[in-house]
Design a protein with these regions (language model features):
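A generic structural motif
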Residues: 71-75
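Long, charged, low-complexity intrinsically disordered regions
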Residues: 1-41, 45-51, 59, 66-68, ...
């Protein structure tokens, strides 16, 4: 096994451990003009991974959104559906808290 493959294997293991140990909080907040916004905090991902997950979420939920200061922001109230998508991505149910 080459060093590159070994490093990739470790990165995969670390990513899985991060998903298991993450404490993701999903909450809704009313923003400007009374518009609901879903916030996902505590995802413990690097910027690129978080941006990729945000893109998947936006496509699945047919909504707009962005990442700001490590927090995923989605337009609309998508708390339940966002939790289901995170479970499919490998996050455990006990690590997801819907507020």
């Amino acid at each position: 096994m080459s060093n590159k493959n070994l490093e990739e294997g470790f990165e995969d293991i670390i990513a899985e451990l991060d998903k298991e140990q993450a404490r993701v909080k999903i909450r809704m907040e009313m923003r400007r003009f009374g518009k609901p916004t879903t916030l996902l905090e505590g995802l413990r991902m690097n910027g690129k991974e978080l941006q990729e997950l945000t893109t998947k979420m936006k496509k699945s939920l047919a909504t707009g959104g962005t990442v700001k200061d490590g927090i995923m922001i989605l337009q609309g109230d998508h708390r339940e559906r966002a939790a289901e998508i995170l479970k499919k991505q490998g996050f455990t149910e006990s690590s997801i808290e819907i507020i």
